[in-house]
């Protein structure tokens, strides 16, 4: 049966880029990858209320650069930049190299898949109905320019004993199209009944690796298939019939009147009864 591949990994080097951009040899790769995982887990816990969409980690020569995309950059920076300095010192101690932290603002948080998933998870933890939270998020995303959105929740929805899945979709979400810009996000809501998982797919249009929209050839009117003649009832007819040549049976002579239609005479009811009675008498 078909499975849903991760949309970001499916489009790497086509219309998406890596979230960790560095190179390491075989001896240092595992150590640096473990550092990245620790940094992401720390930022997720530290900046839980800052609406962080994604984190990009780059490692130039003997230092590191971390870019945090957030819809609330003021919460990350703090009053007079105090929080950002504390964050920078903690990351430097964790990674062992000087760290530069950049903050990028997300202009439309309603169309960011990760922020939508986190928002729905927070609402579910506050005992808000999952259908209401999902439909409200879909309406806000479509209103602000998304061409399609799909949201799926799975777990003990509304506290039922048997876990199930429910999903809603609005617009187009072409997951098989590589040039489609699909933003994917995942979140978890820790409720009293258990963990509920939220997956969000947002379709923002088509784009290529350089950020440009692809050029789609539109067929001209001459290239389109012409339709056949129409019937009297208004429906298009199929293959046009060729006229019969002269001299063949069924072909009318030129200039002659149309042949009269044969009509079989119907016997009266009395004659039929008389014939039946005569047959019985003969027997």
From Swiss-Prot:
A Pfam family matched in the record: Ribosomal_S3_C
Domain KH type-2: 39-107
Keyword match RNA-binding: yes
Region annotation (Disordered) ranges: 219-283
Biased composition (Low complexity): 237-260
Keywords: Ribonucleoprotein, Ribosomal protein, RNA-binding, rRNA-binding
Name this polypeptide is given: Small ribosomal subunit protein uS3
């Amino acid at each position: 049966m078909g499975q849903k591949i991760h949309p970001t990994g499916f489009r790497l080097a086509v219309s998406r880029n890596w979230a960790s951009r560095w190179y390491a040899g075989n001896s240092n790769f595992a150590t640096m990858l473990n550092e990245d995982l620790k940094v992401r887990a720390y930022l997720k816990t530290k900046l839980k209320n800052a609406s962080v969409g994604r984190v990009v980690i780059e490692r130039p020569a003997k230092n590191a650069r971390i870019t945090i995309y957030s819809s609330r950059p003021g919460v990350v920076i703090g009053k007079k930049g105090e929080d950002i300095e504390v964050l920078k010192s903690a990351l430097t101690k964790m990674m062992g190299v000087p760290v530069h932290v950049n903050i990028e603002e997300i202009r439309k948080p309603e169309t960011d898949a990760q922020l939508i998933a986190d928002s729905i998870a927070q609402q579910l933890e506050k005992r808000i109905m999952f259908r209401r939270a999902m439909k409200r998020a879909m309406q806000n995303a479509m209103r602000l320019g998304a061409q399609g959105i799909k949201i799926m929740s799975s777990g003990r929805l509304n506290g039922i004993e048997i876990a199930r899945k429910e999903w809603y979709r609005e617009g187009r979400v072409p997951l098989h199209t590589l040039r489609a810009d699909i933003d994917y996000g995942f979140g978890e809501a820790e409720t009293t009944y258990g963990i509920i998982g939220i997956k969000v797919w947002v379709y923002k249009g088509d784009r290529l690796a350089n950020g440009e929209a692809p050029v789609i050839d539109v067929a001209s009117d001459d290239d389109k298939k012409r339709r056949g003649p129409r019937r009297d009832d208004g429906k298009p007819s199929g293959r046009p019939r060729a006229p019969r040549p002269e001299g063949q049976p069924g072909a009318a002579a030129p200039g002659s009147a149309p042949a009269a239609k044969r009509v079989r005479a119907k016997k009266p009811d009395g004659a039929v009864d008389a014939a039946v009675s005569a047959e019985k008498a003969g027997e």
